[in-house]
Each structure stands twice: as C-alpha cells, then as structure tokens.
Regions:
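Sec-dependent signal peptide recognition
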Residues: 1-8
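Generic cytosolic/nucleocytoplasmic N-terminal low-complexity/intrinsically disordered segments
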Residues: 1, 18-19
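C-terminal motif of bacterial Sec signal peptides marking the signal peptidase cleavage site
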Residues: 13-16
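Extended repeat-based scaffolds of very large eukaryotic assembly and lipid-transport proteins
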Residues: 20-179
Length: 179
C-alpha cells in the first residue's frame, strides 16, 4: 500500500513537471510567451546525430490568433533572444541592437506569428521585422508604430477572422510589410 501511494505521488509530481513545456503541436500561447520572456523556451530541431539546430516554431492555428494579437500589445525588448523560433532559411539576424544587446520586440514577433497563421504558412516572411515600405523602408518600426500595426491586425481579424478565405491580408494597402 505504501508503495502504491508513493508511486501515485511520484506520478503526480512528474506530470506536474511537464506543464512548463510548450507542446509545439498543440501550443498554449500564454505559456509560449512566458517562456520567450523568461528565456526558457527550449523546443529545438535536432540532427540525426543529436546536434541541436534551431528553435522550432509552435504549430499555432486560427484559434490562437486572438491570443497572439492580444499579447502583441507588449512591446518589451527581450534579450537574450537566441531561443526565439525564427525562419531557418533567413540569413539575417532578426533582432535589434539595443546598446550592444541583441533584442527582439515581443509585440512585433507575435504579430509575425499571427500573420503566419493567417497566411497558412510556417513563417510569415524570412524575418519577424516590420517595416514602413513607403516612408522608411530601410528602418524598423518603433513601439508606437508596432501598436498601430497591431490595431490594423485586430480590426482585420474582427472583420475577417471568421472567414475561411478572407478577401485580403491584414497589411494589404497599409504601407506596412514584413521583411
């Protein structure tokens, strides 16, 4: 009887340990964001030889878009940022240098995740970098501009999120685009 009780307690403890891992096939957006912020996201692609490659993007779906857009109001710059899943095909580093620290703006990154879901792609572009294609095509957006773009996404989602084949994408005609 004591062995069964001990086994049950250990099972509960072990099950509780897994709650801090993001299931990339059925992700929890809030847990993903928490892990990005505290630097503990650790789902990586691996070689057959067991070498770590790059962080794997969770398989977000349309049900996750409202949470991604809601959490995109956070324009905190996160550093270190080497645990952020980015497009492995890109040769550009997606972060901003703040002082001498590479950082990723969380809100911009989450909008990029939402755009990928809306487009039905693994990644929205090569890089999670928003630009104003008309006025400042060679500069990244600042936090106020990111929040303006977030409003475009929210308005678009409210009007089109229920459609299987929306007539446009959130940034169409806005002058903003993904790098």
């Amino acid at each position: 009887m004591k062995i069964l009780t001990l086994a049950a307690i250990l099972a509960v403890i072990c099950i509780g340990c897994d709650k801090n891992t993001v299931d990339v096939n059925n992700p929890d957006v809030e847990e993903f964001v928490k892990q990005l912020k505290d630097g503990t996201y650790n789902n990586y692609a691996w070689t057959e030889g067991g070498e770590r490659l790059w962080p794997v993007m969770p398989a977000f779906d349309r049900d996750d878009v409202p949470a991604l857009l809601a959490l995109a109001e956070d324009t905190e710059l996160i550093s270190p940022c080497d645990h952020f899943p980015v497009n492995p095909l890109s040769s550009m580093y997606p972060w901003r240098l703040v002082g001498s620290k590479p950082s990723i703006m969380l809100g911009e990154y989450l909008l990029w995740c939402a755009e990928a879901v809306i487009e039905g792609q693994d990644f929205a572009s090569l890089n999670p970098v928003l630009i104003d294609e008309i006025r400042k095509p060679d500069q990244r957006l600042d936090s106020d501009e990111i929040l303006s773009v977030r409003k475009l996404y929210q308005d678009w989602w409210n009007a089109n999120g229920h459609l299987d084949n929306p007539p446009s994408l959130p940034l169409d005609g806005s002058g903003y685009g993904w790098h």
